[in-house]
Each structure stands twice: as C-alpha cells, then as structure tokens.
Amino acid sequence: MIVIYHNPDCGTSRNVLQLIEAAGYLPQVIEYVKEGWTKPQLLGLFAAADLTPRSALRTTKSPAAELNLLEETVTDAQILDAMVEYPILVNRPIVCTPKGVRLCRPSEVVLDLLDHWPSGPFAKEDGELIIDERGNRVYT
C-alpha cells in the first residue's frame, strides 16, 4: 500500500500523486491540511524518513516566520507543537511505501519508493521530463 500526505494546492505534491497513479498504483491520499496531524503520527513519519521537525518545516508560503519558528533557539518540540496546530507547516508531500518513507522534494524522489514506474514518458506540470519515452529516469 502507498500513502501520500498530500496538499492539492502544491505543484510538487500534485506531480508526485500523478506519478504514483501513472505507475498504476491507487494510493491512499491524506489531505493533511484538512485532516491535521497528531504528534505521534508526525514523530513516526519523521523517524521513518530520517527527518526532524526542523528539517520537515515548510519555511515559505507558511506562517513559520510569523510564528518565529525560524529562529535558531526554537526547539524541535516547539516546532512539533506548531505543526499540530498549523498543519500547513509540514513540508510535503510525504510518501510511505513498503520501500520506505520520504519527503518527496523534488518530485522524482518518489521513484526511489516505487517498485515500478510509468512506462514513459512522464513530465511534471511545468514540462520538465522525469521519465523518458523508454521508461528511464531522466537526471538533470
């Protein structure tokens, strides 16, 4: 089973979801901004993805700066509390598969988590090619 913690307003998140679906998977899609987070859920995801609250913090287009979360003196516990209160603070998308858990930025990171890929070609919304016409990953 594949789970994607998704924000439909995010181009990277949309690209990752489309890539997963184009590969033939039917992921469980969790719109985390609507559903929110729990501390245990975030701690589990961060541990599995080798992230910390600070490294998973969305610093742009979020209230991180106005909440003073970008200061070096802010602890991971404080960031985690803020993430539970303001789900948009968590960077996205986070994808879970039997191969692991990753913050999939850039979009092509998700390929490392899939057993099979779209047959190709596959391009991001902006036209950047991720998989060529032969089904091979494009490295830029």
Curated annotation (Swiss-Prot):
Signal sequence interval, chain numbering: none
Enzyme class, broadest EC rank: oxidoreductase
Active site (UniProt): C10
Listed PROSITE patterns: ARSC (PS51353)
Site residues, Important for activity: H6, R58, R92, R105
Role description: Catalyzes the reduction of arsenate [As(V)] to arsenite [As(III)]. Does not constitute the major arsenate reductase in cells: essential only in the absence of ArsC (AC P74313).
Family: Belongs to the ArsC family.
Protein name: Arsenate reductase ArsI2
Lineage: Bacteria, Bacillati, Cyanobacteriota, Cyanophyceae, Synechococcales
Gene coding for it: arsI2
